[in-house]
Amino acid sequence: DASGVFSGDTWSAIHYYLWNPINIHRVVATVAYGGSVVGAYAAFKFLSAQKQEERAHYDWMGYNANFIAIAALLPLPFAGYYLTAEIYAYSQQMGITLMGGVFAWLFIIQAVLIGALFLSANYYLWCGMGRSEGAYRYNPKIKYIAIVLVGAFLVWFTPHTLVPTKSELKGLGGPHHKDLGALGIMPAKNTAVNFLIVFTYLSFLFYRRSNKIATVSWAAAGNAAQIALFAAGLINITILGVYYGYFTNTVYKVAASVPQVLTTLVISILPPTTTIR
């Protein structure tokens, strides 16, 4: 009521404004975490197996577990953005407390964990490519994917403000780092996480196609179309993040995250049908 006293029943306390966003986020996160745990178990059993049949079984188990983990990991940041947007819509003070207040460092810890999941998933894919005879075509590209992933990961968990001591505050000249402070706001993080998703998807495409050769007559045109799709999408994500994130007002800054997500979804959903060379 007006005095702040809750007078509803148990269901009213549970089924509140953030019920659906939290459920969506938790379900997606649980699937991603479960797939990762099963994949880690399969990797351990694969390394310790003595028989070839056991190694083949756990290799198959790891492949399916990693597929499930990546399938849930790719939309997980979007589910988190949806939850955060609903929190701000419900209470701006709650959102400020979450992102810039007492819970801000929990967000940083969560960002580190999510980034570690992305890097681990990619590393699993690259190790799988090492056992594929046809992966030599893609091996030279892996180092560039790794550089982008690590760079995006560093931006992803860079904090905007710290809780410094007086001496640290004096040394920084304020609560924000003069060079890295710009990487701590959401436009940079939105751009970074979209790059994480796109390049993880690219690693998965290379992994799936390591032992496949395109035989259709339009393979060259198909490859060119795929490369153009990825290039145009990444350029669009960068422009939306940099220009609308730093050179326009707050309304456009927040709204730019939506076309970024749509761009990533278009890149991921449009199924490439030939092998990228």
Language-model segments: residues:
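Polytopic transmembrane helical bundles with strong interfacial aromatic enrichment
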Residues: D1-R277
